[in-house]
Amino acid sequence: MAAGKSTIGKKLARKLGVKFYDVDDMVVTEHGPVSDIFYAQGEQQFRKYEYEAICKALDSEPGIIALGGGAVTYDESLKVLKKRAYRVFVKVPPEQILGRLRRSHTVRPLIGATPSLSKIKELYTARMPRYSHSDYVVEAQDMSTAQVVDQIAQWLHKKNIKL
């Protein structure tokens, strides 16, 4: 949630010369705006669409996949990601997320039009057990996008992970 996953993912994919997949964009292309799906069909249906998009990306050519912040809350998504992908958590503190959300023009369905630190912390706390099981965690609080991209690329190289 507002950790910069899409921006980082695009830049990392470009640096590595691989394809980039944005799961939210894939869902929007197939089913319409995220907020419309949440309001008309509910979060559970959105998570199913998200899972389908994740599977489609995993079945395509290798690359970088940017997930929505809540993707790993859906058990099937987490299961397939654990089995078929390397998972990187870009860890940004809730206060920084709040600042980013306040500057954003996108309304996040689980946060609402007026983001609050308490709501962000509530979601963050609920999701943290799933985030913390990532293969790699980037403590990104004081890092630029370029630094985060470089750190992930270095980790991939060190682990001899080829995409």
Protein language model regions, located:
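The conserved Walker
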Residues: 1
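Short glycine-rich anion-binding loops that position phosphate/pyrophosphate groups of nucleotides
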Residues: 69-72, 93-95, 143
